[in-house]
């Protein structure tokens, strides 16, 4: 068993049963290709999403260290911050969130609805900043201030994307491999690539469990040149933690994130509407809409390695639909 070292790491079980892996019949007919979807949008806390897999490991480490406060950072409409706040509430911990407004909007829905509304429901302490120019340093500075107030803080990086958090997506690769075994031979796997933890964790896990499947990250915030070192560095850090080798090529497509992170584009919004109308499944304008636009566009461009079945990793994010109204 190549991933046996996973069991060495403390983990809180928030998710329970595996999330569904489903065939999309109407969407497949529309695209002329077999499309499957991994439904991490329906993880069972705070309207779902992929970050809960990372938080199973990160929150366990926080409790091990005796923390009483979780500190993290992100944009106003961060799915990660929303799920971190929910985990803190469930565990009886304080949560402090350092937020930025990366698109400089004054739109009321973006500033108060969607994920931001949920942060208030989870009783999150909000600290605003002009920009997360050096989030690791900014989080450490915030942790120092919180500690001076008598709390015992545990810092969770942006997106939960360090080697420990990314183990959640090595675990996910195990789940995917078990669900596919004897049912479908997945040719390609598509995932949104942002803070890089989900992408890197899948890269390590799938290399050992489904080596014939190519993994493609569709960038949501950076060019290939900027994103590649982030994914590779995390891939190698995860492999080191698990005492494995990681030599799988990291494939990135950066044609679909313009005009920038957190700004919807036409292709992404069309993908959101298409999957909603054909399958009743909700994507979001920031991550999964753009990643699905990459899947759709690259079928017609024949950029996949062959014409076999494609698995789309649905990382969640639907609460942001309300924040981006009326653009949706």
UniProtKB/Swiss-Prot annotation:
Gene3D superfamilies: 3.40.50.1100. The modification N6-(pyridoxal phosphate)lysine is found at residue 51. Its EC number is 4.4.1.15. Pfam families: PALP (PF00291). Keywords: Lyase, Pyridoxal phosphate. It catalyses: D-cysteine + H2O = hydrogen sulfide + pyruvate + NH4(+) + H(+). GO terms for biological process: D-amino acid metabolic process. Its cofactor is pyridoxal 5'-phosphate. The keyword Lyase applies. One of its GO terms (molecular function) is D-cysteine desulfhydrase activity. Disulfide bonds: none annotated. Catalyzes the alpha,beta-elimination reaction of D-cysteine and of several D-cysteine derivatives. It could be a defense mechanism against D-cysteine. HAMAP family: D_Cys_desulfhydr. This is D-cysteine desulfhydrase.
